[in-house]
UniProtKB/Swiss-Prot annotation:
GO-annotated biological processes: female meiotic nuclear division; homologous chromosome pairing at meiosis; positive regulation of meiotic DNA double-strand break formation; reciprocal meiotic recombination
Function: Required for the formation of DNA double-strand breaks during meiosis together with narya and nenya.
Annotated InterPro entries: Zip3/RNF212-like, Znf_RING, Znf_RING/FYVE/PHD, Znf_RING_CS
Miscellaneous comment in the UniProt entry for this protein: The name 'vilya' derives from the fact that this protein contains a RING-type zinc finger and vilya is the mightiest of the three rings of power given by the elves of Eregion in J.R.R. Tolkien's books.
Keyword Zinc carried by entry: yes
Region annotated Disordered, chain positions: 172-237
GO molecular function terms listed in the Swiss-Prot or TrEMBL record: SUMO transferase activity; zinc ion binding
GO cellular component, one term: site of double-strand break
Gene inactivation effect: High levels of X chromosome non-disjunction at the first meiotic division, severe failure to initiate DNA double-strand breaks in oocytes in early pachytene and complete failure of meiotic recombination.
Gene: vilya
UniProt note on tissues of expression: Expressed in nurse cell and pro-oocytes (at protein level).
Protein name as it appears in the record: RING finger protein vilya
Superkingdom of origin: Eukaryota
C-alpha cells in the first residue's frame, strides 16, 4: 500500500495490482522500487535486472532479462514514458481494442495468480506446521509439568532419606559409644575383682598347706605303739 504526504495509508488502485516484478513479484503500486519494461515484454524491478552501459556513451543502457536470458533494451515505468509503451498498462485494455495489450496484461495476471497460489500453499503448510508445533509444544509442556511434579516428589523423598540416614548414623554412633563405655566399665570392674581375689587366695593357700604339713609331721611324731584293749564286756557270773 502506498502512503500519502500526510502519512496516511492509501489503498492502491485495483487496476495496478497486477503490475509486478516477473522475478520477485514485488508490486509496482507499493512504490518501493523502480520498475522497468524490457523489449522482451517482461517487467522487472531494479533489484532483479542487470543493467550495463550501451556500446557508446550516448547509447541507451542494455538490460539482461532473467526470464528469457537475453540482452535487451528497456524503459523505466513512469508517466512520461512513450504512449505506445504506456498503453500496455492501461486500466481498461478492453476499451482500446488492442489484442496485444489484453494478451500482455492477461499473461501478467496469470503469472501473479500462480505466485499467489504458491504463497497460499506455503501459508497453508506453515499453518499446518504451526498447528503441529503447537500440539507438540503442548504435549512437551504437559510432560515438563509432570516431570517437575515428579522431580519435586523425588527431592522430598531424597531429603527424607538423607534425614533418615543421618538419624540412623547418629543412633548407631550413640549405640557404639554406649557399648564402648559399657565394655570399658566391665573390663575395669573385672580386672579389679581379679586383683582383689588373687591376693588373699595366694596367702591362704600357702598358710593352709604349711599348717597341713605341720599337723602331719606332729602326727607322725606322736604315734606310739600300745596295748590293744578289747571291749569291756561286764557281766555277772
Amino acid at each position: 500500500m502506498a502512503k500519502s504526504q500526510a502519512g496516511q495509508t492509501v489503498e492502491p488502485e485495483a487496476s495496478k495490482l497486477w503490475i509486478h516484478c516477473n522475478s520477485c513479484c514485488a508490486l509496482f503500486c507499493d512504490k518501493k522500487h523502480t520498475f522497468f519494461l524490457l523489449a522482451c515484454h517482461h517487467v522487472f524491478c531494479e533489484r532483479c535486472v542487470k543493467v550495463s552501459a550501451g556500446r557508446t556513451p550516448s547509447d541507451a543502457p542494455i538490460f539482461e532479462c532473467s526470464t528469457c536470458r537475453r540482452s535487451v533494451r528497456g524503459r523505466q515505468l513512469t508517466n512520461s514514458m512513450p504512449n505506445h509503451f504506456k498503453q500496455l498498462f492501461h486500466p481498461e485494455p478492453f476499451t482500446i481494442g488492442n489484442d496485444f495489450v489484453e494478451t500482455f496484461q492477461r499473461g501478467n495476471h496469470r503469472h501473479f495468480d500462480k505466485y499467489k497460489e504458491r504463497k497460499e500453499l506455503e501459508m497453508d503448510k506453515l499453518f499446518k506446521d504451526i498447528e503441529v508445533a503447537k500440539s507438540v509444544c503442548q504435549k512437551r509442556f504437559l510432560e515438563a509439568q509432570m516431570l517437575r511434579v515428579e522431580r519435586k516428589k523425588l527431592m522430598q523423598r531424597s531429603r527424607y532419606i538423607k534425614a533418615e540416614v543421618a538419624n540412623r548414623k547418629a543412633e548407631m554412633h550413640r549405640m557404639a559409644q554406649a557399648y564402648r563405655s559399657r565394655s570399658l566399665t566391665s573390663q575395669s570392674s573385672s580386672s579389679a575383682q581379679r586383683s582383689a581375689r588373687g591376693r588373699p587366695r595366694g596367702r591362704g593357700t600357702a598358710t593352709q598347706s604349711s599348717s597341713r604339713r605341720r599337723s602331719t609331721e606332729s602326727a607322725k611324731r606322736q604315734q606310739i605303739t600300745s596295748f590293744i584293749h578289747p571291749p569291756n564286756n561286764s557281766f555277772d557270773l
